[in-house]
Each structure stands twice: as structure tokens, then as C-alpha cells.
Amino acid sequence: MTVVLIVAATRPQLAVLADSVRTFHELGAQVHLAGTFHLAPVSKELTAAELDGVRQLPRSVRGSSALRRKAAESPTGMRVWLQATGDNWLRAQARKADVLVALDSKAVYTVWRLAQHNRGAEALYGITPALRAVEALRDRGDAAPRRGMRDSLPSAAVVARDVRRSVSGLPAVVMRTATARPVMRSAVGARLWRGAVTAPGVPARLRVSASRYVAEGMESAGRTSGAAIALAAAASKVGDLGIRASLLDESVMKEISNGLVPGKLPQAVAAQLAHADDRFTRGDFPEAATALNRALTLNFHRVVHIDQLSSPLARKAGAYVEPLYASKVMRALGAPRGRRTPHAPAPTGRPLRLLVTTSGNANFLHHILSHFGDHPGVELRFLDLAAQKSLMRISWAGRRILEDRLAGDATDYQEEVERLIRPYLDWADTVFLDWAVGPASMLTTIDPGDTRIVVRLHSYEAFTRWPHSTDFSRIDDLVFVAPHVRDLVASLVPQLRGEHAPRTHVIDNAMELAGFARPKPAEARFRLGLIGIGQVAKDPLWAIEVLRLLRKEDDRYRLSLVGGDMSAKTSHATRDYLQRFEKKLAPLVKSGAVERLGATDDVASALTGIGTILSSSVREGCHVGLMEGAASGALPVARDWPFYAGRPNSARTLYPEGWVVETPEEAAERIRRHTGTEEAWRKAGAAASAHALTAWDWPVVRTHFERLFLGTE
């Protein structure tokens, strides 16, 4: 027989209750009623209703003064539960029940709590859903009831009323109790609260407050996406542009902070842009800049583009930034201001004054600085912007840069950049800025006068916000390290496709490769090498799969990993990848199949024992490690970098035919084919070394830089 337990906090319409009990009986069910309302005055009516059991639950909270204070401060639903929770009869009946019914909205929380101890029971709100459930149980015979509470939620009006009453002025500790981890772990509790934050008629202030408590509870319960959904749902009911943008920002950051790419990211960016447009139209440039700053930060967050094995920019770059440039603020930001006078030609009666600058990353400048530092036609100075606090501060001041542009170059930031940077511009004939990040945006804030501005963009920058706040009309020459990077950036930044675009060049990174060509021992034939594993984009798991396929047929193959490890502190997404990688790696290191060489300043020596050099990355500019390995005489095997595969320019157009493969299976096949004999392996390595030295060695690349800076060979 089906057992129904009805819980009521307020006196029901007794005639309706009696009719319902008769219907339950006709369906073969027993019906028990437990109420916190005063049963004694209506005892005759309850007896006439022929209930199978009636229980008067405590009408007030019993216990310590602290518990009574908590009850007094709690929402009505929780207060009912605190009254009833200690009743043994109620708990016993709840464990036996097939259907648990909340007769009114105040009893919903109590029924939900009881259902946590009887997972097989239906937990419902209202008599009609309960009758349907009992009828379904009868029709199914002995079949187990189906869990669910689609009909259990109170009406929107009831929820709105309760939320207004409960949230207004409620202490934070009480709200946190109502949205605590046990509640939010349940689909029922989570759905109940999501319904509450979207209920109609709730004032914006209360809706925002409630949604944040709900999100906090869901996140604590491990429902990260649920927390994001709750905040986004509340945002959809808020009319204020600033509040809506703030809630959607919080929503997507819940997921980003956990290494996830948010589903609501386009909506969050659009909300910030709408808020920015509104403030910009009203002349509120500081607030417009703040909102635009958040839009750019979210749109180009590293968790979305850098710490993943894919990116929206790798799929449809133009479509991804189209909504961004449809906004008023981005059109204002992207308007080219140009320079008042063209840059002066290189001097003829004295050496060229060349200022080479970067901010903390001079990794690719050593050969340039060494060569031009000794060049008779060049007077060289080097400026590391990160070495001076004042220059560091203005170089990465993203929001201030935006505000200055939106305000028409009329802020104190403009004055500060003029004061700090103008002396360097006045001295230099040519400025060469490495990395198109914050300093490029800062430098193009002011007119460069007649100084020539040259900026180099590697690969990383394409996936950041910085090209979108740089005024390329004030840059004379833009240097890319590879054609596929040039193509991607041009598709992202409208200024690079307009009449004010700078001249573009493709010049390889400066590498001294001749010293890598050293003899290799015969046993290196079976040693694979991967140089650089410190980023998710390097995807060393791909290299592990290549090794697995090779060792399946010949266990002489080994893998050496050269370079520092990824940092789990970079982001949650990086940590997740690192955990997967370490799990795969541990048994291979233990067995000797993989050797971790760690970071080294002498890559050339490490390469003497490596016979095959891998590029397993999902994206690269020009993979220096692969080029160094090829120069050493190792067999090059490069993955067709997925971010660029199939495009007019990619790894296949950067490297000679045959070097690039699509899958680990193709990589393993290429390695087997060229390492089958020592003669074949050495022949392939010699050909690779010859190509590397004639195409990428510094004496070759140096001529391109001399032409760039001096107009000579």
C-alpha cells in the first residue's frame, strides 16, 4: 500500500483536505498529516476526514536560546523545519512514506529535508501533484517511484512573496544557512533557489543579494555551473545595465576560476559593452572605461584562449570579435589617430640611435642587442620598462589607457606618459618594442613625433586584449614571427586592415643555430625530445601518445623532456591539465621510458643525446625548440598545430614538406620510417640541419633586421 505523508504549516481548507483524503483512499493509499498549526481546534474535522494518522508538531522552537534566536531570524520555511526536526514520529513516518507532500509553501523546506533521508520517495508541493503521483504508483504496481520535484515548486507569486519577506534585512549568516551545502547539493534545493532569484516582483537589490548567496551555496556544494546559472538567471531579470553586467561578470568568473570556459561569456561581454556604451554616451568616461576594461578582460581571458587546447579564436576569429567592434566604445577606441608628422629617415651623418625596449621579457633580444650594440652604424640603448616602477605602472595601466582614449586624450594619464616617455622618444631615431602587449598600448597613447616606431608581435599577444587597445596608426612597422600569426591578428584587429595600417614584415626569431650541430651517438636514434613543456599549449600529452605508439612495437624508444614544468598556480585550467599529464607520466618515468631533464641553459648539449625532435603544440609562432633540434641533426616531427591547421598559412607552410604530421599515428610512422636504420636516421638529420642553418641561423636572419633598421644588407 502507498503511504502518503502530508506536512502543513498553516491550517488547510478542511473540506478540500477531506475530499482529497477520500480520493487518496480510493487509490489505495494511507494518508498521514503532520502540522505545526494548532490541531486541537479542528480535531473533529480532522477525525471526520478519516486520516490514517495525525500528528501535532511543535508549534514553537524548543532548545537553546541560540537556536531560538536563529529561528526568529530565519525565513519561515526554515523556522518550520527547526520546529519539526526533533519529532521522532515525523521522522519515522517520513522514512516509510512513498509520497511526501508540502501542503503550503512554508512546509516545502521541511519536506525537502525529510526527502534527504528517503531517497525513494516523491517529494511534492500541493495535493494535485501528489494525487497524480499516487495514481502513477498504483498504475506501476510495485515499481519504484520516480524521483523528481517538477511539480513541487511553489508558484512564482508565492516564491516572490517569500523571497521579499525573507531576504530583506536578513543577516548574512542566516541566508548562508538557507543556501548551505546540503541544500545546494540537491537538485531540488538548487532548483528551488534558482526559481526564487528569478521570481517576478522582487526588488533588484534583494534579487542581487539573494542570487549571490545562492551562488555561494552552490559553489560550496560543488555546483560551479549551477552558481553561474543562478547569477546569470538573476541578471536576466534586472533592468539596470550596471547591475546586470556585474552579475553576469560574477557568473562567468565562477566558471573561469574553476578552469571552465563559460557558456554565458558572450552575454557577459555584451552586458559590459552595453553598460560601457551607455556611460560613454552620457560622458561618464571613467565608468565607461571600467566596463570596457572588464569586457576586454573577459573576452580575452587566458583560461578561455591560452590555458586550453582550443580557443574560439582558433575556430572563427573574425566572428568572435565582431560583437566587440559593434559597440560604440570599441569604435571610439579603434579610431586611428595617426601621427602629426611622418617619421624621419635614418640619419646619414651619424649612427642610428636605436632604442630597444621590452617589459621584463628579453628572451628573444640577446642576439639583436649583441649585434647592434657592436654595429658601427648604430648607437644602441636598451630600456626594460619593468625595471622602473614608474614606467612599469604606466605600461600595464589597461583601464587608464582606455579612459584616456575614450576621453579624447584628455586625462592625466596622457600627461604622465608624455613626461616619462617623451625623453626616450626625443633621443631615439627608431624605437624597437618587443612584444605587442601593454607597453605597445601605452606607447601609442602619445604622438611619437618624428621617431620611427617598430613593434614585434610574437604569437601569445594574438590571444590577449592588448592588440585591441593599441593604436596601430602610430606604429610604422609591425614585425611578425610567422605568416600564420600575421593572418590571425589581421583578422582580429580592424585597424590592421585599414588605410592607416603599419607596414608588416615577417622575420624569424634570432637564433644562433650553428653551435647546435654536434655529433650524436648511435643510441640517440631511439631518443625522442620535447623542448618546452611549461604551458598547456605545448600539449606534452600528445608526445606521450606518440611514445606509446612507438613502444608498442619497439621498447627501445625513449622520451626526454627539456624545460621547466607547468605551474599549477597559473590557472585552474593549467592545474587540471598538469594533473592529467603527471598521472600519465609517473609510470613512464618510473620505468625509464621518459626522462625529465628540467630547465637548462645549455640546450645544445641536451640535444646531443636526442635523435628525434618533436613539436606537440596546439599553437606556436615559430617553435624555437623544434628549430634548434633540427639544427642539431635530430629528425624533426611537427604536429600540424590545430589552432592554424587547414589555413593558408600554418605549420605546413612554415616547415619543409614531410616534417609536419596530423596525428600521433602519423608521427610514429614518420619516426619508424626514418629511424629504421642508423644510415636513414643520420641522412634525415643531416638534411634537417642543413635546412635549419640556411633558413633560420642568425647570420641569415640578421640581414633581415639590418634591412629593417638600417635599410641595408
Q: Where is each model-derived feature located?
A:
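A short, active-site helix/loop in glycosyltransferases that binds the activated sugar's phosphate group
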Residues: 465, 476-503, 511-513
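A charged, aromatic-enriched C-terminal amphipathic alpha-helix characteristic of glycosyltransferases
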Residues: 515, 676-709
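Non-catalytic membrane-proximal stalk/linker segments that position and tether the catalytic domains
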Residues: 1-2, 131, 136-198, 204-205, ...
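Short hydrophobic beta-strand element within catalytic cores of glycosyltransferases
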Residues: 635-645
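Aromatic "clamp/platform" in nucleotide-sugar-dependent glycosyltransferases that forms part
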Residues: 618
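Conserved donor-binding/catalytic core segment of Leloir-type glycosyltransferases
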Residues: 354, 521-538, 544-551, 559-560
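Nucleotide-activated donor-binding/catalytic signature segment of Leloir-type glycosyltransferases, i.e.
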Residues: 573-599
